[in-house]
Swiss-Prot record:
It comes from the Bacteria. Binds 1 zinc ion per subunit. This is Queuine tRNA-ribosyltransferase. It comes from Campylobacter curvus (strain 525.92). Its cofactor is Zn(2+). Catalyzes the base-exchange of a guanine (G) residue with the queuine precursor 7-aminomethyl-7-deazaguanine (PreQ1) at position 34 (anticodon wobble position) in tRNAs with GU(N) anticodons (tRNA-Asp, -Asn, -His and -Tyr). Catalysis occurs through a double-displacement mechanism. The nucleophile active site attacks the C1' of nucleotide 34 to detach the guanine base from the RNA, forming a covalent enzyme-RNA intermediate. The proton acceptor active site deprotonates the incoming PreQ1, allowing a nucleophilic attack on the C1' of the ribose to form the product. One of its GO terms (biological process) is tRNA-guanine transglycosylation. Homodimer. Within each dimer, one monomer is responsible for RNA recognition and catalysis, while the other monomer binds to the replacement base PreQ1. The keyword Metal-binding applies.
Length: 388
């Protein structure tokens, strides 16, 4: 993998990330294909209509079903899903966190109960890489120890703050330990001829504790990861705490490597964190919101189910050139949604993902032109009316 920063504008960066399967302009948004498909779309949609260069697949879900060995028999994710561009696979740590009622973390890894059949499994720093070697993704994420955050940590009582601090410190200690195990194992596997075209990213934990983030970032930057991710945000904390944490940790992340903010987020979150130096994003929001009838536009969000769109002949966004907006009206989409027609999911998902990918293109162009601040002002000015 090769990463090069081509242009900076303040802390915002425009660059290019090259894997064995695609050349990716950054900052980039990665659509989420949890079980090997972006919901309601196929590889042709992703490649030919949206021109997506990289998508995310989930190690936890692919491990449980159909199993990474099955995927390997098809030639990895690229052969199985027929998407011949890049894949990033997360480690499954977030899914274990989200299912924490059935999960137990210890010094060796994460023990969890399958949401499918109740069977018991144990993820370790090595086992999640073994799964990802079989998936043959371009970018693999290490196992990390995630902490649930309160919306406002400053509002906690003294005892609650002490408990949270203790848990965050444990998370950082474990994450650093697991990172060392992962990078050593990856070097060993590559020396044996495995994963030669696969890259490995470390994940920085530490909650909203700046000192903990600094410790974790500095430790992981000393390891030869191909990229570094900021994990453990957008898990309950208010947006301002997310932005402050990203801003605080950035000086301690190697500028020569791509920076990935995991699970984020809204268009506003993306703009704010690009300004702080983030290169890569992923989130289920564009497709999840699409299925629920919330569509993104340059001017805000549309709840397409609303009655005022029944006779609306306009496209979702008059400024949008996506597949859906060039063909269909708000009135038609309103009808499809109300009729529970499955076609709606595809058309709405194509639109929302186009919106996100086009937003990234506009951001890259603004950074390259040295006009990111102007772009940000216009972005917020157009959206000041809120939901349409």
């Amino acid at each position: 993998m090769k990463f090069e920063v081509l242009k900076t504008d303040g802390n915002a960066r425009a660059g290019v990330l090259t894997t064995a399967h695609s050349v990716i302009q950054t900052p980039i948004f990665m659509p989420v294909g949890t079980v090997g498909a972006v919901k309601s779309l196929d590889a042709t949609d992703m490649r030919e209509i949206l021109d997506a260069k990289i998508i995310l697949a989930n190690t936890y879900h692919m491990y449980l079903r159909p199993g990474s060995r099955v995927v390997a028999e098809f030639g990895g994710l690229h052969g199985f899903c027929k998407f011949n561009r890049s894949f990033l696979t997360d480690s499954g740590g977030f899914q274990a966190f989200s299912l924490r009622a059935n999960t137990k973390n210890d010094e060796g890894g994460i023990k969890f109960k399958s949401h499918i059949d109740g069977s018991i499994h144990y993820f370790t720093p090595r086992s999640v890489l073994d799964t990802q070697y079989e998936l043959d993704s371009d970018i693999m994420m290490i196992l990390d120890d995630l902490v649930e955050l309160p919306r406002d940590p400053h509002a906690l009582g003294a005892d609650e703050k002490a408990r949270l601090k203790k848990r965050i410190d444990l998370s950082v200690t474990r994450t650093i330990k697991w990172a060392r195990e992962a990078i050593d194992y990856h070097k060993f596997k590559q020396s044996q001829g495995a994963g030669l075209d696969q890259n490995i990213f470390g994940i920085i934990q530490g909650g909203t504790d700046y000192d903990a983030r600094k410790i974790c970032a500095q430790a992981l930057c000393e390891m030869p990861f191909d990229g570094l991710a900021i994990g453990g945000l957008s898990v309950g904390e208010a947006n301002e705490h997310m932005y402050e944490t990203v801003e605080a940790v950035m000086p301690f992340i190697d500028a020569a490597r791509p920076r990935y903010l995991m699970g984020v987020g809204t268009p506003e979150d993306i703009v704010e964190n690009v300004q702080r130096g983030v290169d890569m994003f992923d989130c289920v929001m564009p497709t999840r919101n699409a299925r629920n009838g919330t569509l993104f536009t340059s001017f805000g969000k549309i709840a397409i189910k609303n009655a005022r769109f029944v006779n609306d002949h306009e496209p979702i966004d008059p400024e949008c050139e996506c597949y859906t907006c060039r063909r269909y009206s708000r009135g038609y989409l309103n009808h499809l949604f109300r009729a529970h027609e499955l076609t709606f999911f595809r058309l709405a998902s194509l639109h929302n993902l186009h919106y996100y990918l086009n937003l990234m293109k506009q951001i890259r162009e603004a950074i390259t032109a040295g006009k990111f601040s102007e772009f940000k002002r216009e972005f917020y000015a157009k959206r000041s009316g809120g939901e349409i």
